[in-house]
């Protein structure tokens, strides 16, 4: 599966997309696989000029999960809530349970711990690499503080 997260694979995806096309994919959990998430986003950024991570709680995984949208020019942050709602209405998607213009912007609003994680340098994944994540070490200290104290 590592081959699906490499710069080489992302270059092939970019070639397959039409201009303005968007690749959307999951990029692991910022809580449990932070180092891997950072590397996957570094890989995407090495290929696509626009990369926007977004977060959603995924009940199946029991944790916050990250996805990303990557494009040569389409930027999901450039859309207003009203524009997203208008596009949904135009396509007859009026009864969605999660997604709306407001949630579009909320999903793309990264919390401070994720912004700090992504501010650190990360090495892109290339053919032949592994996705071993040192943060998976059971002895590694991981603290997610939701309140002061």
Task: Give residue ranges: language-model regions.
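Conserved class I S-adenosyl-L-methionine
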Residues: 1, 27-41
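Conserved beta-strand signature within the Rossmann-like core of class I S-adenosyl-L-methionine
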Residues: 20-27
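Short, electropositive alpha-helical surface patch
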Residues: 35-53
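Generic recognition of short, well-ordered alpha-helical segments
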Residues: 4, 8, 35-39, 65
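Ligand-binding pocket scaffold of soluble enzyme catalytic domains
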Residues: 7-10, 25, 41, 52-57, ...
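Soluble small-group transferase modules, centered on the S-adenosyl donor enzyme superfamily
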Residues: 53-149
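Generic secondary-structure boundary/loop-capping signal
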Residues: 1-2, 105
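A short glycine-rich, Lys/Arg-flanked "PGG" loop and its adjoining helix->strand segment in the class I
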Residues: 5-19, 41, 45
């Amino acid at each position: 599966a590592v081959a699906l997260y490499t710069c080489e694979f992302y270059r092939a995806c970019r070639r397959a997309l039409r201009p303005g096309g968007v690749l959307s994919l999951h990029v692991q959990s910022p809580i449990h696989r932070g180092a891997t998430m950072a590397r996957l986003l570094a890989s995407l950024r090495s290929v696509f000029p626009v990369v926007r991570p977004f977060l959603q709680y995924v009940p199946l995984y029991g944790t916050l999960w990250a996805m990303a949208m990557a494009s040569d020019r389409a930027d999901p942050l450039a859309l207003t809530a009203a524009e997203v709602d208008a596009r949904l209405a135009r396509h007859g998607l009026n009864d969605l349970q999660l997604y709306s213009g407001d949630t579009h912007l909320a999903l793309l609003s990264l919390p401070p711990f994720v912004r700090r994680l992504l501010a650190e340098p990360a090495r892109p994944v290339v053919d032949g690499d592994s996705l071993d994540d040192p943060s998976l070490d059971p002895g590694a200290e991981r603290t997610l503080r939701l309140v002061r104290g």
